């Protein structure tokens, strides 16, 4: 980031919107969506969760609220908003969706669409005990600092994957979540 502080207005002016996917026509059974919640503050924050240790997949990992698209979802955006409400009690009407990032393929076979939205600073988060162990906020300027992410090349089932690693306080941010944050940084013009 440049030396001046990252304000919400500055973030929004640099965010180059992609056309949001609004219909279900392109969806198949392996689609998922996550909400990338930017907290509206003079110096914005990025809301993240730590998944419950009891979950079958990605237990204990830092993640954005989100999950698989289900039959009731009219769109990928609707899926992200529903999941955010289920996991951390963010009301869909409180989210100002500003766009989507390119979909990411997960190691579990889902194509995950990150939905970027602005949320008010005074929301009372209530973590779903079955899914979320903790909810925390990271300063957006710090989250988007590309130098904080370190690559790790792994080989799985004969395929090469590059994942990104970082720490924030006592939280280990890596994998798809770190990749989505990096993509957001690149989307607003940060240089690697």
UniProtKB/Swiss-Prot annotation:
Residues 29-160 form the Nudix hydrolase domain. Belongs to the Nudix hydrolase family. PCD1 subfamily. Probably mediates the hydrolysis of some nucleoside diphosphate derivatives. This is Uncharacterized Nudix hydrolase NudL. Pfam families: NUDIX. It comes from the Bacteria. GO terms for molecular function: coenzyme A diphosphatase activity; magnesium ion binding; manganese ion binding. A motif (Nudix box) lies at residues 67-89. Mg(2+) binds at residues 83, 87. InterPro entries: CoAse (IPR045121), NUDIX_hydrolase-like_dom_sf (IPR015797), NUDIX_hydrolase_dom (IPR000086), NUDIX_hydrolase_NudL_CS (IPR000059), Nudix_NudL (IPR023735). GO terms for biological process: nucleoside diphosphate metabolic process. Its cofactor is Mn(2+); Mg(2+). Its EC number is 3.6.1.-. The gene is nudL. Keywords: Hydrolase, Magnesium, Manganese, Metal-binding.
